[in-house]
Amino acid sequence: MSRFLICSFALVLLYPAGIDMYLVGLPRIAADLNASEAQLHIAFSVYLAGMAAAMLFAGKVADRSGRKPVAIPGAALFIIASVFCSLAETSTLFLAGRFLQGLGAGCCYVVAFAILRDTLDDRRRAKVLSLLNGITCIIPVLAPVLGHLIMLKFPWQSLFWTMAMMGIAVLMLSLFILKETRPASPAASDKPRENSESLLNRFFLSRVVITTLSVSVILTFVNTSPVLLMEIMGFERGEYATIMALTAGVSMTVSFSTPFALGIFKPRTLMITSQVLFLAAGITLAVSPSHAVSLFGITLICAGFSVGFGVAMSQALGPFSLRAGVASSTLGIAQVCGSSLWIWLAAVVGIGAWNMLIGILIACSIVSLLLIMFVAPGRPVAAHEEIHHHA
């Protein structure tokens, strides 16, 4: 079992590493490519676009051909794209490389969640996804620090060579450690069960909405945090970094505590707790009389996301044993596109950073609480499939 957990964690971590590792080198990248930092900030959106594009096909291929045939090309593409970015001499080529990086990371991301659905029952999967969420929270803190240390002695290109080496490690794991977990193709008698795993299932759609809104909350916070903390609240850059590190610490602590909480409380209770924390955060930020109270509200955001997201993802994947890849892709596309659409629309309409965050917190909590309380799971399918090792 440990091989599947290690491989799944490695496959997922390419996604945040690809986002956070290069940011510290952005000024030098812009200078070398004769582009402004503002022009290169679009690299974040381009990377997410690549991920979304990969998710359009990766899940279906993973369900038809297996997890390894998607993970291996995905990791290989991430390696090639990282090298391509390091060799880019224009901003256009650099952005093309970032799109390809997103494609590779997206393939790996989809496969990771499908593997966990294949190999773990509902309760264990919820615990593992909570742990995975905690580990993912480490990357935004450690990746920029690692990038800074690398750039003390090496040029910015070394950041992408480091990403390439990470991709090589994931490729080796996918080739030699990961075993195929895709359930055997259903016999004719099993076709009704395959057809019953509809993406239009009310319970699945409710969890798509909940997880998409939750991701929108956390990405809105990350996207607006420089404005909130430095421009509005007046913190210095060093203080901003310290606060973000502390929020990551809160996220990790809650994420690593959630598996123990699942041994005591029902998953539904933790999901309700998550949304109540979001609602409390929104109200706190809306009426905050001081910076200290606002910072407390921010910690509630991190705690709320960490306590509920892994549980919601596990519930979303639960109804799918034969179409776990497609379900994982659908979740990923909805989360990436939904959160990006909200941030873009809020910016176009002219909603300020503070109100943008408060608005999504309150909307997420109200909608999600209604869905949790009124959309019950249907008849469960097999909790997990026996792993068939394919020749």
Curated annotation (Swiss-Prot):
Bilayer topology annotation: Multi-pass membrane protein
Pfam family, one: MFS_1
Location (main, coarse): membrane
Localisation: Cell inner membrane
One example GO MF annotation: transmembrane transporter activity
Record keywords, A-Z: Antibiotic resistance, Cell inner membrane, Cell membrane, Membrane, Transmembrane, Transmembrane helix, Transport
Source organism, top-level taxon: Bacteria
Transmembrane segments: 4-24, 42-62, 69-89, 93-113, 131-151, 158-178, 203-222, 245-265, 269-289, 293-313, 331-351, 356-376
Keyword Membrane included in the entry's annotation: yes
SUPFAM superfamilies, A to Z: MFS general substrate transporter
Record-level GO cellular component terms: plasma membrane
Family: Belongs to the major facilitator superfamily. DHA1 family. MdtL (TC 2.A.1.2.22) subfamily.
Functional note: Confers resistance to chloramphenicol.
Protein name per the record: Multidrug resistance protein MdtL
Species this chain originates from: Escherichia coli O139:H28 (strain E24377A / ETEC)
Gene name of the encoded protein: mdtL
